[in-house]
Structures are given as structure tokens and as C-alpha cells.
């Protein structure tokens, strides 16, 4: 049996790795029975032992395994292992270790031979101190740590004392530090720096590496902010040597010793060009580029049109043309010759089109530009699309036999001469030619209240400031020449008409739901400026221009098989979404809010449709015009269901039309039972014939603007004409009723009102300059007085005289006298009531108290318990005090001299004249 006894003293534990291995080998050699296995374990101890393992690690376990029979060695080694672990736990925070991870420990093991030179020197003990795990811990190290803590605490206390003393001295004397105090302050600062340096020596490598990286990054960032290139992996000293710049001399008295962060050159000292660096891809600004750039792969990004003074060569994208502002030379011919000139130059007729039975071709919608056509168009199959009214100077041919639709008149602009006689004599010429009264109308019927909108006027004018045009159901079988809806159109509802051209003027809020006919070919449709939205319209123009300030153009489902010549959506257009359309040319110009839901027909070819500037909305319209112009400032035109089989010449919705709602007629109507709907008043200077008998519809009066002559008397005389024409007093009114309180406004009265029962409702106080009549007898409501601003005269006397002005001083004394009680006579006094006598049976007998038994009676108080003599505490006698301990009851009074005593003052006697009388004598009053 091999017995190994090793005494682990602190000196033995303080040995380093080599000494520990040598001593173990010497102990093994001293053993009488050598063991090759034990020697092998000891020899391999140097390879297994490292500074990161514990003192009781794997080498000691090999020794324990080699000698399993020696239980004393096992117990001794385990006790030593526990004690060493405890000591390491205690001094772990003192030796600078930060508890690194296993990855760092493996790095230390692999580099243990190169890390021998990384030890630092302690400033107090001047010994090399390792910063790795497994430091030697001895008594000197414990003493050193204790001295360091004491030094640090003393430095803090001394610094606080010196600082407090210096601050107090400066606060009192108002001076700077003296030489002696400055020296004390510097000494305290030196102690603080020494303590910081000692802590820096204890920084482990993991934290030291992070600190070095931070210093390098800070130095590089400072150099980068100074205008020098950015080198993130070079230190400040390397940067200084590489760039060849010297740091400026320190200007302060106490400069920092480690100036790695201050070795930078200010930007004002850099006067030489910088060497090339890796950041050459950061080019100079475009202000310094005076030479053209070489060609690159991004040649599709062309120069802006302001600098384009020469025409572009032909390319595959010829349909994307150059803007007209920069186009100074004509474009070369291209394959898109179907993009013709605009209709401003279209003065020549179009060639004859294919017959209606022929199938539509792809080239039918590619019309010639109107700008290049300077001669009249030849006749075509679509002769129902008439030429504009400027060329029509002859009367129209006679019309068809009379029908129910003859109420629709011909517009006045188209008539330069009188119409020939026809069967439709009830369709009169416009009011400019009519100076005679209308013939009598037909007898009234039950259907006269519901007016028929199926009429065909020659001209319909819906004037200015009309906000919206909606639900316009036009007639399906008639052909109107012209319809004009004027400026600022607020609302046009419930109309059914079919026109040739329609013009919706500027500032129209929205144009939407325009379902046009699928088989007709309009010449032109213009929706003018300021059109915010065009929604839900179904039409197919040859050219559609939506002008400036249109917010959005969306949901335009145009036909997919047609080829437009050109579509331009101009500047400041917010959105064009979901558009399916095929115009010959469509221009949506600037600042148009929205054009949406325009489902145009896929088989028709209009010449042009223009939606001009700032048109807010045109919604729900179904029409197919030859030309439609929606003019300026029209808020909305919506729900225009036009007929699908007719061809109007023109429909004009003019500028700023305010409101036309539910109106049946703007032109001269034939005579009917509804004579309350009068003709326009501009040309009618003669009185109207007598109307039909009074009916329930007579309340609907004709506007006063249309009446140039007085109306005949009717049953509705309570609805009078405006006061501008009435300068005579009103006739006497009906007998007084409950409704007389509702008076006529004063501005409508040019004469005095007749007397009525409601005279208490007087006219305003400006007309009343006379005193009011005497009031009614006094009542409880007299306290509520009339306001003072309504009274121009004094009020009459009333019973409430106690609400008067303040009484005089003499009246106040009489009012404050107590009144004597009135003496009552013996006959007037009531005798006191006599008490009522009660019978014996009515008197309740008094209840006797119930007698209680002796057992029920509780004793008054328990008897006191008898105590023994030993239980009684003797009374304590008061302690007698000595005479010296007794304080005198009160100090003796100090004797004063006669001169110190002040004599008592006698009260001053007052004269009889100075004495005020106590109360005035009461004045004697008489009995009266």
C-alpha cells in the first residue's frame, strides 16, 4: 500500500504551477514503492493544470483515484478543496475577475503561453498581478486590498474636506484658491487618479477589449468629424502617423496625460487635398460638374424637356410624345398617323362612313384630327347629327303630325326666320317673337297637379348658381335642338330631355354615372374647367379632354378593343384609377378632382369629348350628345339618363347655375289648365286671359319676377304680390281670430294697419311718442313692469304705490313708528272652549306594577371578598425631607425706596359743560 500525505499550507498554495509540480514529484520520489502510474499522473499535472481551473480540480481527483485505500488522504483533499473554493468565492470580486464565459476560458487555455506578458503591476505592492482566473491569493494580497480600500476612502474624505473648505473660503472672501489650497486640491486629484489607475489594472481582458474598441471608435469618429477619412479599425496614434498631421499644443494648464482622444487636427488647418480613399463612389455635387457625363445604362432617363432643343430620334415609344412646350420642330412621320390634329382646325367634312349594317372595324374610331381639316365634311349616313347652329340660317322643314310630345319646343338660337305653318301650331316660337296673349287653355283635370316632363322645348335655359344636375330623364323619341344649363347650377332634378349638344360649364363639382347610348356617334362632348369628378358615365368620345384642377379620374371602363389616338392626363391630377376607355384623344388637365366610373360604349366613335377645368361632379346621367360642354363653376351634374336612340344636336349646361329643381318649363308653353305656370316675362307685356275656376293648385303662384302686369283676382288673395308694386293701403281684414297675433312685418307695410282686436300688440316704440292710456285695475301681475326703454311717457297711477321712489327722511320716521294694537271688545272676543267631561267607563284604569319574586331579583352588588393579612400591602410612609432639601415657598419681596415708587394717578374731574347728555328727552306726542 502506498501512503501519501501532503500538507497544504498557505505557502504551498501560494506557489505557482512549476513549483507545485516539482514538489509533488519530490514527494512521489520519496515513496519506497515507486508507482509508475502515480508518476505518470504527476508528470501530466502540468499539462492539465491551468490558471482557469480550481485548486481542487481534476489533478487532485487523479491522485484520489490512484490511492483509493488511503481514506485519510481522500478526506484531507476534499476538505482542502472546499476551503480553497470558499476562499476563491470570497476574493473573487477583489482580484478583478468578472466571471467570463466558457468561450473566453477556452481562449485563455489556448493562448496561455502568449498571455504571460499581459500581467500588470500593482502600484502599491509593485508586484505583477495577473488578470486571469486562478490568481495567487496570499496574505499580502489581502493586506494590499485592505490598504487600497482605506486609501480610497481617505482620498474621498480628504477631497470632500478640501473642497468644502475651499468653497467656504471662496464664498466668504470672494477670492480664488491660494497657492497652498491649490496644492491641496491637486494632491486630492492625484489621489483620485491613483485610485482610478489601480482599478484600471484590475480590468479583465474581456472588458479591456471592449474598452479598447470604444477608444478606437471614439478616436476614429473624432477624426472623421474633423474632415479626415474614417478608419474604424485604426487607433488614434496610427491615424496620426499615417496622415502626417501633428496635434496642436495643449492650451490648458492641466491637460490630460492620455490625449488619444485629442490628437486631431482642426478642420481649419487642413489646407492640402486629401489622398484618394475607398469612398470615391461618393461623387462631387452636381454644381461642380461642368462636363457631360459618359453614357450609362440608364439612358432611358432622359434630359428634362427644358433643355431639349432638338427633336428626339424615332424610337419604339413614339406614342409617348414630347410635351408641346419644348416641341419646336415638327415630329417625323410615324406609324401612329391616326393621331390627327385637334378639332379647332376641322373645317372640312369627314369622309363618308360605312353603312350601319357593316360590322365595325378597328380603324373606325381612328378619326382625323380636327385641327388639320379646313374644309367642310362630306355627307354621311349620320345626318341626324346636325352641323352647329352657326351654319343654320334657314327655317326648319315642317314637322310631323301633332302628337303628345309636341310640347317640346325648338331652341330660339336656331331660328333666324319664321317657321312655316304646320299642324303643330301649339308649338310656338320663342318669346322674342310673341307679343300677344296666349289662347285659353283646356279644362282642368285631376292629373294637372302631376306635370308631364315629356316635352321637347326649343331651348331650355337653367340659369346661374345651380349646384347640381341630377336625375334628368330626357324624352326617348324627340329631338331637341339645344338645352342650356347655365352657370353655378345647384340642382336640376327630375328632368327628361334629349338634346343635340350639352355644355356643363366651369366649377362643376362632379360628373358621374353618365350612361351614354351605345349606337350613336356624338361629335363632341365638352365638360369644362374645375370638374372634380366624373363618375359612372358610359360614353365613348373621339376626344375627351378633362381640364385643369380635376382631383381624380378613376373607374373609367372604356372599351378594350379600340385604339385611341392620344390620351393626355395633365398636371396636378391626383389619381386615375381603373379606367377602361378608348377615346381618340382624352386630355385630363390640371387640378381636376376626380373623374370616375365613365363606362363608355365600345362600338361608337365620338369626335371629341372635353371635360374642362374645375368641374366638381356630373353623376348618373344617361345621354349621348353630339357635343356636350360642362362649363365653369357647376357643382354637380348627376343622374342624366338620356334616351339611347336619339341624336341631339347640342346640350349646354352653362356657367354657375344655382338651382332648378322640379321646374317643368322655361320656354313658352301652349295653353293648358295650369295657367299658374306662366311664360317668361321678358317679352310678355300684355295681361293674361282669365284663368280657370279656382282650384287647390292656385296656391302655387307665379314668381313676381315674371309678372309685368297685375294678376286677376282669385280666391287666394291672402298670398299677395311683393310690396315693391303695392303702394296703396291694404283692404280691411277679416274679423278678429286667434291668428291675428301673427302680424305682417313692418317692412311690408307702406300704410297703417286697420284696427283689430289685438291692440295690445303695439308698433315699435320709435313711433310712439305719446303717454300710455290708464292701465287696468290693480292685479297680482302689476309687479312685472314694462321695461324702461319702452316708456316714452310717465306711467299712470296704480294701486301698487308701495313700489315707489325712496321716501323722504320725514316719511321714514313716521313709517318706522310701531303701530298700537287694536283693542278688541268683549263681544268680539271668543270665549275659551270648555273641557269635555268624560264618563267613568271611558277612563282607562291605571296599571299596577307587577310584583317580582325574590329569586328574580338580582343582588345589588356582590359581597367583597375577604383578604388575608399577608395579602394586604402595607401603606408606604412618606419620605421625610431635610430642611436643606425644602425649597422656600416664595421668594421674599425686594424692598424698594420711596423714590422708586410711582404715585397713583387720580382721575381727572370733568366739568358740567363737557359732560354729554345721556339721551335726549322724549318728545311728547298728542293723542291725535
Swiss-Prot record:
InterPro entries: NPB13-like_MII_rpt, NPIP, NPIP_N. Signal peptide: none annotated. Residues 349-359 have a biased composition (Pro residues). Its main location: membrane. Residues 242-452, 663-928 are annotated as: Disordered. Residues 406-416, 698-708, 740-750, 782-792 have a biased composition (Basic and acidic residues). GO terms for cellular component: membrane. Coiled coil: none annotated. Residues 252-263 have a biased composition (Polar residues). The chain crosses the membrane at residues 73-93. It is found in: Membrane. Keywords: Membrane, Transmembrane, Transmembrane helix. It comes from the Eukaryota. It is a single-pass membrane protein. The keyword Membrane applies. Belongs to the NPIP family. This is Nuclear pore complex-interacting protein family member B12. It comes from Homo sapiens (Human). The lineage of its organism: Eukaryota, Metazoa, Chordata, Craniata, Vertebrata. The gene is NPIPB12.
Amino acid at each position: 500500500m502506498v501512503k501519501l500525505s501532503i500538507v497544504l499550507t498557505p505557502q504551498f498554495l501560494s506557489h505557482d504551477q512549476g513549483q507545485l509540480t516539482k514538489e509533488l514529484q519530490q514527494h512521489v520520489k520519496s515513496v519506497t514503492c515507486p508507482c509508475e502510474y502515480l508518476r505518470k499522473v504527476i508528470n501530466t499535472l502540468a499539462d492539465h493544470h491551468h490558471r482557469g481551473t480550481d485548486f481542487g480540480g481534476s489533478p487532485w481527483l487523479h491522485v484520489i483515484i490512484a490511492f483509493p485505500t488511503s481514506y485519510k488522504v481522500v478526506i484531507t483533499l476534499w476538505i482542502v478543496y472546499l476551503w480553497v473554493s470558499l476562499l476563491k468565492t470570497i476574493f473573487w470580486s477583489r482580484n478583478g475577475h468578472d466571471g467570463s464565459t466558457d468561450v473566453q476560458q477556452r481562449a485563455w487555455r489556448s493562448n496561455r503561453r502568449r498571455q504571460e506578458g499581459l500581467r500588470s503591476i500593482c502600484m502599491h505592492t509593485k508586484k505583477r498581478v495577473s488578470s486571469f482566473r486562478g490568481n495567487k491569493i496570499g496574505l499580502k494580497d489581502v493586506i494590499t486590498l485592505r490598504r487600497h480600500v482605506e486609501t480610497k476612502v481617505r482620498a474621498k474624505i480628504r477631497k470632500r474636506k478640501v473642497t468644502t473648505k475651499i468653497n467656504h473660503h471662496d464664498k466668504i472672501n470672494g477670492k480664488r484658491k491660494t497657492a497652498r489650497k491649490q496644492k491641496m486640491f491637486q494632491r486630492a486629484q492625484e489621489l483620485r487618479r491613483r485610485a482610478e489607475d489601480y482599478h484600471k489594472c484590475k480590468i479583465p481582458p474581456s472588458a479591456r477589449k471592449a474598452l479598447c474598441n470604444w477608444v478606437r471608435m471614439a478616436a476614429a469618429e473624432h477624426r472623421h468629424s474633423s474632415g479626415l477619412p474614417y478608419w474604424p479599425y485604426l487607433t488614434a496614434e496610427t491615424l496620426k502617423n499615417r496622415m502626417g498631421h501633428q496635434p496642436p499644443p495643449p492650451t490648458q494648464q492641466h491637460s490630460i496625460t492620455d490625449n488619444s482622444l485629442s490628437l486631431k487636427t482642426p478642420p481649419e488647418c487642413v489646407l492640402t487635398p486629401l489622398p484618394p480613399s475607398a469612398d470615391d463612389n461618393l461623387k462631387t455635387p452636381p454644381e461642380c460638374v461642368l462636363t457631360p457625363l459618359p453614357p450609362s445604362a440608364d439612358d432611358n432617363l432622359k434630359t428634362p424637356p427644358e433643355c431639349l432643343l432638338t427633336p428626339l430620334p424615332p424610337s419604339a415609344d413614339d406614342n409617348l410624345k414630347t410635351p408641346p412646350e419644348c416641341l419646336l420642330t415638327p415630329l417625323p412621320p410615324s406609324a401612329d398617323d391616326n393621331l390627327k390634329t385637334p378639332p379647332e382646325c376641322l373645317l372640312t367634312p369627314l369622309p363618308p362612313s360605312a353603312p350601319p349594317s357593316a360590322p365595325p372595324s378597328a380603324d373606325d374610331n381612328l378619326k382625323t384630327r380636327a385641327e388639320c381639316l379646313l374644309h367642310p365634311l362630306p355627307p354621311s349616313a349620320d345626318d341626324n347629327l346636325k352641323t352647329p347652329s352657326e351654319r343654320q340660317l334657314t327655317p326648319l322643314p315642317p314637322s310631323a303630325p301633332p302628337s303628345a310630345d309636341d310640347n317640346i319646343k325648338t331652341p330660339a338660337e336656331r331660328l333666324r326666320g319664321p317657321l312655316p305653318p304646320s299642324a303643330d301650331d301649339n308649338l310656338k316660337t320663342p318669346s322674342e317673337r310673341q307679343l300677344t296673349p296666349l289662347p285659353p287653355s283646356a279644362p282642368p283635370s285631376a292629373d294637372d297637379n302631376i306635370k308631364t316632363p315629356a316635352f321637347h322645348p326649343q331651348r331650355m335655359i337653367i340659369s346661374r348658381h345651380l349646384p347640381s344636375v341630377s336625375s334628368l330623364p330626357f324624352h326617348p323619341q324627340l329631338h331637341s335642338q339645344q338645352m342650356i344649363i347655365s352657370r353655378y347650377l345647384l340642382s336640376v332634378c327630375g328632368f327628361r330631355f334629349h338634346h343635340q349638344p350639352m355644355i356643363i360649364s366651369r366649377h362643376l363639382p362632379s360628373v358621374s354615372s353618365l350612361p351614354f347610348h351605345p349606337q350613336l356617334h356624338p361629335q363632341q362632348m365638352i365638360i369644362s374647367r374645375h370638374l372634380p369628378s366624373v363618375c359612372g358615365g358610359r360614353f365613348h368620345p373621339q376626344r375627351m379632354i378633362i381640364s385643369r384642377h380635376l382631383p381624380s379620374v378613376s373607374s373609367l371602363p372604356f372599351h378594350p378593343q379600340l385604339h385611341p389616338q392620344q390620351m393626355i392626363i395633365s398636371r396636378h391630377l391626383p389619381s386615375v384609377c381603373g379606367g377602361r376607355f378608348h377615346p381618340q384623344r382624352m386630355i385630363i388637365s390640371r387640378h381636376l378632382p376626380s373623374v370616375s366610373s365613365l363606362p363608355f360604349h365600345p362600338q361608337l366613335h365620338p369626335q371629341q369629348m372635353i371635360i374642362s377645368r374645375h368641374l366638381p361632379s356630373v353623376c348618373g346621367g344617361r345621354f349621348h350628345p353630339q357635343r356636350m360642354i360642362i362649363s365653369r363653376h357647376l357643382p354637380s351634374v348627376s343622374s342624366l339618363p338620356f334616351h339611347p336612340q336619339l341624336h341631339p344636336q347640342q346640350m349646354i349646361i352653362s356657367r354657375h347655375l344655382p338651382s332648378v329643381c322640379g321646374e317643368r318649363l322655361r320656354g313658352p308653353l301652349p295653353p293648358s289648365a295650369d295657367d299658374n305656370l306662366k311664360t317668361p316675362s321678358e317679352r310678355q307685356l300684355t295681361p293674361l286671359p282669365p284663368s280657370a275656376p279656382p282650384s287647390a293648385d292656385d296656391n302655387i303662384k307665379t314668381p313676381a319676377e315674371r309678372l309685368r302686369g297685375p294678376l286677376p283676382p282669385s280666391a287666394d288673395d291672402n298670398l299677395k304680390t311683393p310690396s315693391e308694386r303695392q303702394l296703396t293701403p291694404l283692404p280691411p281684414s277679416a274679423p278678429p281670430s286667434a291668428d291675428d297675433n301673427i302680424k305682417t312685418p313692418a317692412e311690408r307695410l307702406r300704410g297703417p294697419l286697420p284696427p283689430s282686436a289685438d291692440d295690445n300688440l303695439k308698433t315699435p316704440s320709435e313711433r310712439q311718442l305719446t303717454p300710455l292710456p290708464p292701465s287696468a285695475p290693480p292685479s297680482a301681475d302689476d309687479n312685472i313692469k314694462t321695461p324702461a326703454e319702452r316708456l316714452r311717457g310717465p306711467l299712470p297711477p296704480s294701486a301698487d304705490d308701495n313700489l315707489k321712489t325712496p321716501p323722504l327722511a320725514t316719511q321714514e320716521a313716521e313709517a318706522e313708528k310701531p303701530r298700537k294694537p287694536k283693542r278688541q271688545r268683549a263681544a268680539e272676543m271668543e270665549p275659551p272652549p270648555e273641557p269635555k267631561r268624560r264618563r267613568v267607563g271611558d277612563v282607562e284604569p291605571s296599571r299596577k306594577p307587577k310584583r317580582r319574586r325574590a329569586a328574580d331579583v338580582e343582588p345589588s352588588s356582590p359581597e367583597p371578598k375577604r383578604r388575608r393579612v399577608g395579602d394586604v400591602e402595607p401603606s408606604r410612609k412618606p419620605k421625610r425631607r431635610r430642611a436643606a432639601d425644602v425649597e422656600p415657598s416664595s421668594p421674599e419681596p425686594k424692598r424698594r425706596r420711596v423714590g422708586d415708587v410711582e404715585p397713583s394717578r387720580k382721575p381727572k374731574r370733568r366739568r358740567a359743560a363737557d359732560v354729554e347728555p345721556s339721551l335726549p328727552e322724549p318728545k311728547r306726542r298728542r293723542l291725535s
